């Protein structure tokens, strides 16, 4: 507290601009201190990562769940464009310090990885269009198995017993999830017309076909990126920038070639009653992709790579539950058992990676 003399405080004798300057410094210091505390807070990092990844999946599911949705290439092109613009804005604002200038040679080297990314995100969106969020989440675990054996084939080594156990649980959870899904679909179509039953089962089969293709693309992308990233010496922001930038023309050209841009089809995909929420969802998904990348790095920095892997395993449970809550996915003994098995398999795999057993 300022000292007083003759009832007049020392602050009252200072010019107004000096008082304001002192207050600005104090406020700036408190904001910096708060930001530093948040940046190093493990709980905040974990929560931000979980919320960003869960919300991204739910928003994608919402956008592609329209009865007449058939513009996935266009959706992903807009998503990648928004991501590219967001990165450039962050760089211009000084929020990203280590993003270099565009390099044509590096872009040419990275182009095959971007093609794999396009395959991964497109097949992922198509699978999410036909499958429920819990089933999609469970089957995503199969990518881990393909990556593990891909690394054994490319680099050498072997799969340890505990990792093998986790893989067995992942396969079992996927089989149980598929069985429960087919049982639910069969029961739902038993009372429907034959045409409706055939359409429902065809959509389910399409979802599993897209999911299988997505597992292959996802594993190929992860394995390929690890090799090419050593040649380009990219950091996280470089990967995000080139992935988004190079994906835009590929996705846009694909949309122009195979998708219907007529006004009638646009009206069907973006009906008036949900147009605003769909546009907001598409915009959010573009920005959220950048936010997930930041939260991933933040989580690893504030905790450890082992904790991050554990969070990834634990995150599958609330994601599956969120899919049930927001999209009314059927709750049966089979579906719940599959979710629990998938959750346990993730924990066992994380333990195997952290202990090397």
UniProtKB/Swiss-Prot annotation:
Localization of this protein: Golgi apparatus membrane; Cytoplasmic vesicle membrane; Endoplasmic reticulum membrane
Keywords for the protein's UniProt record, in alphabetical order: Cytoplasmic vesicle, Endoplasmic reticulum, Golgi apparatus, Membrane, Sugar transport, Transmembrane, Transmembrane helix, Transport
Membrane topology note: Multi-pass membrane protein
Ranges facing Lumenal side: 65-68, 129, 183-196, 260-277, 328-332
Membrane-spanning parts: 44-64, 69-89, 108-128, 130-150, 162-182, 197-217, 239-259, 278-298, 307-327, 333-352
InterPro entries: TPT_transporter
GO cellular component terms listed in the entry, alphabetical order: cytoplasmic vesicle membrane; endoplasmic reticulum membrane; Golgi apparatus; Golgi membrane
Major place of residence: Golgi
Biological process annotations from GO: GDP-mannose transmembrane transport
Molecular function GO terms recorded: antiporter activity; GDP-mannose transmembrane transporter activity
Residue ranges that the UniProt entry lists as topological domain Cytoplasmic: 1-43, 90-107, 151-161, 218-238, 299-306, 353-357
Biological role stated in the UniProt entry: Involved in the import of GDP-mannose from the cytoplasm into the Golgi lumen.
NCBIfam families: nst (TIGR00803)
Record text on subunit structure and interactions: Homooligomer.
Entry similarity comment: Belongs to the TPT transporter family. SLC35D subfamily.
Protein's name in the database: GDP-mannose transporter 2
Organism: Emericella nidulans (strain FGSC A4 / ATCC 38163 / CBS 112.46 / NRRL 194 / M139)
